[in-house]
Every structure is written in structure tokens, then in C-alpha cells.
């Protein structure tokens, strides 16, 4: 059970926004390697583990899971904030305001998704969800430093995983928990 918990936690902490899953694959390989005869990663970041049978007549079986996660992509900078009106995967933008995020630069920069203040809004606008284009990422950067973050930089949730009893909560668990389950088949 300890190893399952560690695998879930480590994989949830790994960054792997769709199209750039290499970091998550490296973490996954750490758990896969002791269970198979060989591992390798292809140019697209896909991780393969091969376990050979001692029976030369054995059938080949494929077990697979994916390790990507939904996220956002930087589309510009304004007043030291990052624009991100592009979502990668099924992001529900209504849940984004005040969410902790990680901008996947080297080193990673932490931030929070901000929304416009309601002071200038009409009564009709107040209480309605913000449009994705209204949201920005605040990393506490100067305008000059924000401009150094290239358009196209991926952004993932900054949620820390946690356990409540035997229940696990964290980002990207829909994909990563499936991988952990495959380790025990």
C-alpha cells in the first residue's frame, strides 16, 4: 500500500501537460523499471515496458495507460501578467479563478489565476462566470520578466496531492491512477 501511495503522489506531482509528458514518463519509469525486463522512451515521450515470458509459446498482451494532463498555454503578456486563452485538454474555465498553477519554464514558476475585480462590472455581469479571455496568471513578475516567458509555454495545475484515509485527491489522477493500477496487474 505504501508503494501505491508513493506512486500516486509522485505521479500527481509530475508535470505532463498534453504534448509534453516527458517529465511524467520519467517518474513513471522509476516505478515501472523494477517490474519489467526493459524500458525505453520514444521520441514522442511514450514510455514502454517489456516483460518477457519464459514460455516461448506465450501470447503477447498489451496493457496501456496515458499520463498526460489538462493544462493551459501562455498566449501573451500584459502588465506583468500572463495571458492564456488557450486550454490544452478539457479545462473548465469556470473553475480556474484563484487556482494555483505552475508555469513550466526552467525553473518552474508558481502563480495564481486571477480574474477582473467586480468593481467595474454592471449588476448583470456580477455573478456570471468570467470568460476565459478575462483570466490571467499572476506570478508576481515585473512586466520585463513576464515578457521573457515565451508564447506557447505550458501551464499546469499547482495542486498538491493529499490523502484522506485511503482516498487520494490530486491533479491528473484520471490518467496517472490508471498507470499505477497497471503496475499491479
PLM regions and their residue ranges:
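N-terminal hydrophobic/helix-forming segments and targeting peptides
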Residues: 1-185
Amino acid at each position: 500500500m505504501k508503494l501505491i501511495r508513493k506512486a500516486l503522489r509522485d505521479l500527481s506531482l509530475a508535470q505532463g501537460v498534453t504534448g509534453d509528458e516527458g517529465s511524467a514518463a520519467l517518474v513513471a519509469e522509476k516505478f515501472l523499471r523494477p517490474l519489467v525486463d526493459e524500458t525505453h522512451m520514444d521520441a514522442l515521450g511514450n514510455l514502454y515496458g517489456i516483460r518477457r515470458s519464459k514460455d516461448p509459446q506465450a501470447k503477447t498482451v498489451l496493457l496501456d495507460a496515458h499520463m498526460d494532463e489538462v493544462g493551459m498555454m501562455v498566449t501573451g503578456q500584459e502588465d506583468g501578467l500572463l495571458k492564456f486563452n488557450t486550454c490544452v485538454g478539457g479545462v473548465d474555465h469556470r473553475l480556474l479563478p484563484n487556482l494555483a498553477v505552475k508555469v513550466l519554464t526552467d525553473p518552474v514558476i508558481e502563480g495564481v489565476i486571477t480574474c477582473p475585480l467586480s468593481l467595474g462590472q454592471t449588476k448583470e455581469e456580477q455573478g456570471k462566470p468570467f470568460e476565459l479571455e478575462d483570466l490571467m496568471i499572476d506570478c508576481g513578475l515585473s512586466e520585463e520578466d513576464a515578457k521573457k516567458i515565451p508564447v506557447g509555454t505550458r501551464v499546469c495545475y499547482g495542486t498538491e496531492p493529499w490523502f484522506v484515509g485511503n482516498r487520494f485527491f490530486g491533479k491528473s489522477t484520471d490518467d496517472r491512477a490508471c498507470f499505477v493500477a497497471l503496475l499491479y496487474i
